[in-house]
């Protein structure tokens, strides 16, 4: 057979689907009970989609196709997300001829150079990648209703008006507030940064440091060294301070809330703190070594402690000033031990080494399993020798901090006897009330980079608009909705619950980037994670909106909040429709149809997306739905999928390690890509794309095509007399139908592929071996039935070649709309499956015996089946499932009693292996019917149950595991 031209087949069926509008559902076709509405997070168009994205979009398409074949009226729409600063940032970097950005777009995304330079205008980036993404989705065979396509921002006014309506509703309900809040901030562009505005670091948490002001006296002047800590309670155990002698520090006037103080902090800290409600005026710059050997006063205990040198202090983390608590901090203990050994460092700074030798550790916390100084014990336990054992030190620190926080009891008055987690809050609060401590926000890691290419800082913003996800009543509604929803996989539910609990105010607008202006404060633009939470409702009416736009019959400015209120929130009213016709210019009957569509499709059945969107988009999706819509319109389910890697490496466009989705289709064909992605991992697990494996799957798919093409020529004559092996294949087909259906209902796409493709392929291979040389009507009937079912089972995964094969099979219409297979009652036959498994297992056992025993030139296989009394033992044990009662019952049988010890051993073995569901078959009959096949497969003469007990093997036979002797 010539090599299969996947591209030609794909183009043929994509064209036919679009021409016939196969995937544009009509709500008049089926009752609401038979509707199925599924959506996936629309892609952000700052570049080409890669094969990781391919998985996110293929999963819902497979489910949509499956439900369509089950007889549901399926809506699977698509739109495009272009909101925010990333696209503007890319345009800016291309304008500035940033080499790395140009390399990504020219070499990784393969944008022609003459088009690349037009990307200085962000609108051209949007147009180019929107066209490319749609082409990719069509080429992938996605069953999208393109009549509902739209994109975000004020560039598409109807959707922008919908977002204005959403925000007016949120504000009306008190969920949008104005105030001060900490946000990620691009200090160059001057804008807050949402998750989607970051090139790197979207998962990096913001830490809240307590900075404690240790006092340094210089003449009459009081200068503060603010030490940053995540453990304010340990201020009682400070033995010294750490400063990096090689880092640059500044003396600065710090003004905050009408109060002015002089601080010494790292140069980097001065910059960061200037964004956090402080005016910083640098007076002097110097190296940290200037401070070494000086003494500062602990503002809580009054102790004077020495400043010691430590190169481990990172000036770019918090204030660059660190307090040392060696009893409870492994790093501090090890650093002091290193200084004791390397006293020449101290001498360099005119510090008497005896000062460090005589430092006394202060025990603060009682911790079960540890003595006075937990940090010291943990360091000894892990065999840490010096600060160079950084990995072990990190481990020790995590262990001690976690244990002390969760189980530690504080020992120092006035907090003695209280749990550490309670004391931590009390001490921090008390210090701040006294003015000896403040808060500083810092990223847990440094790699937080905006899409403009700038390193982010944390800024306290005033007069910023926020969505108040911390509102307790709103949280309660979100929890109620989540409790009613299906979550796939269910293991993700706890994560959603936790996020609902900790979610707080979130900045919802910025002053740069593409988007929809806030309706009441238009200098602010709604950001990308805030305008993408309820657009699934907009899809339900977008077909009508698009048609009106194309016909020039729509004035978006007339799409007032009143219009959206009626469509999405109110009851049907002919009077209201007539009123709105006058106000909007939209005919009343079309307004009525829009409302009908919304009421038909809502609630949304499934929302699909990658697991990275659980902490933001997917949780915001729940919150915004419960805020705006009636309870009967709250979403019903969320399905989450994992990530993709490429040849074992994380995909990264910035490193060029990325495979564009469209390139994967070009190289392999859409059906190969789809099947490969679906076969690699269950939806929540991560997958790894390997080119070699893709090639192997392509050949298997070509074999599938070849087999169905061959079987299409057979005639499926009914009422033929089937042989046992024919019945076996039909039974296995029933199992494949059942297995595929169940897996797809639960979004377990890998299991579905195992059943729909590999299981049938393996069963067919076995059937062809068992029926070699046969070409009768029964075989042709079975293979023709298999072809008809197999093509339909595979259609959600490989729709193009299945359409082609369906046509060859003479199927009616499109396979995409064909009836999903259902098991045929009369095909069920567990007995024949047990019989075939028995034969397969026997062949494997005999081959293994020959190999292990290294039998050269074997001639004969003597096979002994289990005697009747052993079957009885299995049946009794299956009923009793307990040794004593089974033995008591068995010993009533005179025949069985003769085999006393053997019976006891067999009962113990059955119970140990829990082999309670062994199905009885006539082993000898099965063997005699399969004798010719066994001899051909094994190349041996097969002798069944001879009188002679060859090699004394006979007694080893147990049900479904015959004894075998080879000679």
From Swiss-Prot:
GO terms for cellular component: cytoplasm. A motif ('HIGH' region) lies at residues 43-53. It catalyses: tRNA(Leu) + L-leucine + ATP = L-leucyl-tRNA(Leu) + AMP + diphosphate. It is found in: Cytoplasm. The keyword Cytoplasm applies. Its EC number is 6.1.1.4. One of its GO terms (molecular function) is leucine-tRNA ligase activity. Belongs to the class-I aminoacyl-tRNA synthetase family. This is Leucine--tRNA ligase. It comes from Pyrococcus abyssi (strain GE5 / Orsay). The gene is leuS.
């Amino acid at each position: 057979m010539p090599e299969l031209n996947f591209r030609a087949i794909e183009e043929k069926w994509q064209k036919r689907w679009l021409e016939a509008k196969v995937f544009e559902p009509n709500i008049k076709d089926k009752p609401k009970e038979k509707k199925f509405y599924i959506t996936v997070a629309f892609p952000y168009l700052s570049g080409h989609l890669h094969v990781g994205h391919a998985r996110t979009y293929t999963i819902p398409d497979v489910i949509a196709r499956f439900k369509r074949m089950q007889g549901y009226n399926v809506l699977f729409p698509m739109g495009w997300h272009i909101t925010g600063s990333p696209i503007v940032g890319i345009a800016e970097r291309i304008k500035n001829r940033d080499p790395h950005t140009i390399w990504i777009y020219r070499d990784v995304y393969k944008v022609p150079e003459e088009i690349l330079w037009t990307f200085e205008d962000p609108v051209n980036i949007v147009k180019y990648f929107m066209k490319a993404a749609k082409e990719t989705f069509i080429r992938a065979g996605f069953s999208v209703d393109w009549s509902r396509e739209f994109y975000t921002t004020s560039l598409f006014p109807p959707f922008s008006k919908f977002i204005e309506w959403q925000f007016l509703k949120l504000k009306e309900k008190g969920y949008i507030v104005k105030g001060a809040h900490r946000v990620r901030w691009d200090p160059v562009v001057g804008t807050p940064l949402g998750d989607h505005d970051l090139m790197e670091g979207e998962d990096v948490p913001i830490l809240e440091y307590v900075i404690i002001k240790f006092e340094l006296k210089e003449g009459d002047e009081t200068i503060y060294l603010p030490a940053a800590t995540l453990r304010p309670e340990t201020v009682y155990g400070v033995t010294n301070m750490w400063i990096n002698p090689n880092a640059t520090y500044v003396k600065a006037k710090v003004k905050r809330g009408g109060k002015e103080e002089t601080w010494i902090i790292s140069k980097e800290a001065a910059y960061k703190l200037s964004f956090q409600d402080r005016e910083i005026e640098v007076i002097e710059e110097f190296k940290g070594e200037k401070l070494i050997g000086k003494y500062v006063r602990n503002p809580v205990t009054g102790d004077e402690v020495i400043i010691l040198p430590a190169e481990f202090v990172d000036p770019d983390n918090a204030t660059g000033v660190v307090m040392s608590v060696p009893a409870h901090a492994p790093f501090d203990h090890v650093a002091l031990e290193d200084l004791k050994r390397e006293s020449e460092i101290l001498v360099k700074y005119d510090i008497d080494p005896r000062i460090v030798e005589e430092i006394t550790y202060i025990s603060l916390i009682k911790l079960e399993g540890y003595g006075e100084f937990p940090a010291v014990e943990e360091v000894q336990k892990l065999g840490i020798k010096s600060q160079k054992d950084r990995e072990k030190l990190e481990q020790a620190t995590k262990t001690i901090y976690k244990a002390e926080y969760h189980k530690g009891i504080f020992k120092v008055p006035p907090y003695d006897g209280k749990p550490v987690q309670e004391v931590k809050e009390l001490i921090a609060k008390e210090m701040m009330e006294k003015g000896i401590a403040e808060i500083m926000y810092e990223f847990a890691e440094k790699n937080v980079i905006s899409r403009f290419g700038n390193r982010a800082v944390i800024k306290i913003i005033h007069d910023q608009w926020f969505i108040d996800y911390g509102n307790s009543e709103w949280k309660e509604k979100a929890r109620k909705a989540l409790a009613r929803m299906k979550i796939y996989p269910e293991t993700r539910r706890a994560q959603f619950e936790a996020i609902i609990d900790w979610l707080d105010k979130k900045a919802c607008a910025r002053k740069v980037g593409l988007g929809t202006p806030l309706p009441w404060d238009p200098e602010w633009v709604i950001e990308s994670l805030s305008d993408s939470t309820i657009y699934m409702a907009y899809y339900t009416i977008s077909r009508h909106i698009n048609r009106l736009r194309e016909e020039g019959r729509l004035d978006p400015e007339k799409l007032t909040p009143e219009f959206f209120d009626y469509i999405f929130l109110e009851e049907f009213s002919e009077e209201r429709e007539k009123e709105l016709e006058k106000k909007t210019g939209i005919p009343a009957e079309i307004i009525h149809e829009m409302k009908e569509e919304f009421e038909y499709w809502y609630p949304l059945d499934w929302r699909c997306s990658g697991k990275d969107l659980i902490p933001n988009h997917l949780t915001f999706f729940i919150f915004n739905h419960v805020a705006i819509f009636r309870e009967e319109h709250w979403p019903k389910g969320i399905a989450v999928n994992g990530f993709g890697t490429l040849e074992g490496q994380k995909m990264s466009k910035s490193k060029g390690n990325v495979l564009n989705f469209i390139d994967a289709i070009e190289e392999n064909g859409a059906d190969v890509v789809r099947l490969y992605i679906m076969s690699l991992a269950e939806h929540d697990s991560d997958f790894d794309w390997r080119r070699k494996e893709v090639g192997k799957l392509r050949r298997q798919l070509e074999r599938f095509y070849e087999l169905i093409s061959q079987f299409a020529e057979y005639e499926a004559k009914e009422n033929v007399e089937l042989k046992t092996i024919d019945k076996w294949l039909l039974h296995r087909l029933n199992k494949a139908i059942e297995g595929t259906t169940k897996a797809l209902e639960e979004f377990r796409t890998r299991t579905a592929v195992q059943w729909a493709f590999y299981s049938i392929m393996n069963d067919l291979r076995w059937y062809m071996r068992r029926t070699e040389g046969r070409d009768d009507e029964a075989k042709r009937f079975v293979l023709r039935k298999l072809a008809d079912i197999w093509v339909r089972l595979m259609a959600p995964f490989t729709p193009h070649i299945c359409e082609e094969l369906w046509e060859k099979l003479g199927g009616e219409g499109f396979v995409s709309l064909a009836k999903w297979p259902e098991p045929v009652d009369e095909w069920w036959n567990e007995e024949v499956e047990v019989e075939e498994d028995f034969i397969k297992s026997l062949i494997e056992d005999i081959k293994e015996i020959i190999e292990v025993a290294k039998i050269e030139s074997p001639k004969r296989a003597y096979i002994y089946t289990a005697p009747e009394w052993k079957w009885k033992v299995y049946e009794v044990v299956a009923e009793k499932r307990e040794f004593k009662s089974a033995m008591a019952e068995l010993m009533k049988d005179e025949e069985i009693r003769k085999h006393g010890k053997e019976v006891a051993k067999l009962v113990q073995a059955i119970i140990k292996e829990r082999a309670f569901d062994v199905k009885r078959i006539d082993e000898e009959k099965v063997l005699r019917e399969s004798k010719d096949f066994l001899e051909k497969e094994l190349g041996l003469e097969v002798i069944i149950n001879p009188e002679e007990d060859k090699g004394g093997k006979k007694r080893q036979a147990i049900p479904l595991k015959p004894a075998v002797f080879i000679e």
